[in-house]
């Protein structure tokens, strides 16, 4: 089987321990070529440790993984030469200009002459930095620096790029423009492996792995993940006394989860028929203005649900 026929990334039961602490616990998955693969989880879920193992920066304690057909433990050097990597920490030189940084990173990957000039032109155009090419990096706004870091990681045209929480600390518009770049990359065939704790960003991935406490709890496309809830089992309650409404219904039979978001409640039912009981109890609690309506499950609903199930199973 040629490399083009194999997944871009294959992980089989990879684990990483630091002394007694297990940061990643027997995680398995595969990433296809040209896919935007999201690794979703809160801080401490094991996302960065996993990405560092795949980039050849950390050896797994156990299990195996390959990237572009190369083993992460035995062939880390081959992997590093062939991938792009954007770490959580900004890794460019703040006392160099935009162009100087790109020339430096191009040189580290063996680019020179016309090839370097072509890639430099591509990077500046793609990141929309033509007017900033001679500006010191430390003077750039956060969104500009993030786009620069991305194209620097892609200067050598790697077939796969690893992005670790790439939009941390930037405003929503900068985040949207950054993700437009990611979409364009995947459209041109580049594989994108991205870690995030943002539900909105995860929604833009082709498939999402849900990580919690070092373990992979679920993996599928976003629409498929949302289908874990039967139709009509996720409802939203709007009322003037949301705290009273929560107290009134959270112990009702048939209520699996209740979460308060501002003046609205998000409720997961065991079955759609349980919704009638909610309406009656809320009104008995003095919330006569309550409006209850079924809504499409969100990725956050899924994440909360699978974590609750995993923690419940661990407690049994």
Give names to the regions the model predicted.
Residues 63, 75, 201, 244-245, ...:
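Short phosphate-engaging motifs
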Residues 84, 110, 230-231, 254, ...:
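A generic structural signal for secondary-structure junctions
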Residues 6-11, 16-211, 218:
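ABC transporter nucleotide-binding domains
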Residues 80, 124, 226, 300-304:
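Conserved protein kinase catalytic domain
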Residues 180-270, 293:
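ABC transporter nucleotide-binding domain
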Residues 3, 269-316:
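C-terminal coupling/interaction segments
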């Amino acid at each position: 089987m040629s490399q083009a026929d194999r997944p871009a990334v294959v992980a089989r039961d990879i684990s990483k321990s630091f002394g007694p602490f297990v940061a990643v616990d027997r995680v398995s998955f595969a990433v296809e070529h040209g896919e935007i693969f999201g690794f979703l989880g809160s801080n401490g879920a094991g996302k960065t440790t996993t990405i560092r193992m795949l980039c050849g920066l950390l050896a797994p304690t156990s299990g195996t993984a390959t990237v572009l057909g190369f083993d992460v433990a035995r062939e880390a050097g081959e992997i590093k030469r062939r991938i792009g990597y954007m770490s959580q920490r900004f890794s460019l030189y703040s006392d160099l200009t935009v162009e100087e940084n790109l020339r430096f990173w191009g040189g580290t990957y063996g680019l020179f002459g016309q090839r370097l000039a072509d890639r430099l032109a591509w990077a500046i155009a793609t990141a929309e930095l033509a007017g900033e090419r001679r500006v010191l990096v430390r003077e750039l706004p956060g969104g500009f620096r993030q786009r620069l870091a991305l194209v620097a990681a892609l200067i050598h045209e790697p077939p796969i790029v690893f992005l670790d929480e790439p939009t941390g600390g930037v405003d929503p518009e900068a985040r949207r423009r950054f993700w437009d770049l990611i979409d364009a990359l995947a459209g041109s065939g580049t594989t994108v492996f991205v870690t995030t704790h943002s539900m909105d960003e995860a929604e833009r991935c082709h498939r999402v792995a849900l990580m919690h406490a070092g373990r992979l709890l679920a993996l599928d496309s976003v629409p498929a993940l949302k289908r874990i809830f039967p139709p009509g089992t996720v409802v939203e309650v709007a009322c003037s006394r949301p705290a009273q409404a929560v107290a009134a219904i959270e112990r009702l039979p048939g209520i699996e989860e209740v979460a308060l978001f501002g003046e609205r409640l998000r409720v997961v039912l065991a079955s759609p028929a349980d919704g009638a009981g909610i309406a009656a109890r809320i009104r008995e609690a003095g919330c006569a203005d309550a409006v209850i309506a079924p809504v499409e499950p969100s990725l956050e609903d899924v994440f909360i649900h699978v974590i609750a199930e995993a923690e419940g199973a661990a407690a049994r």
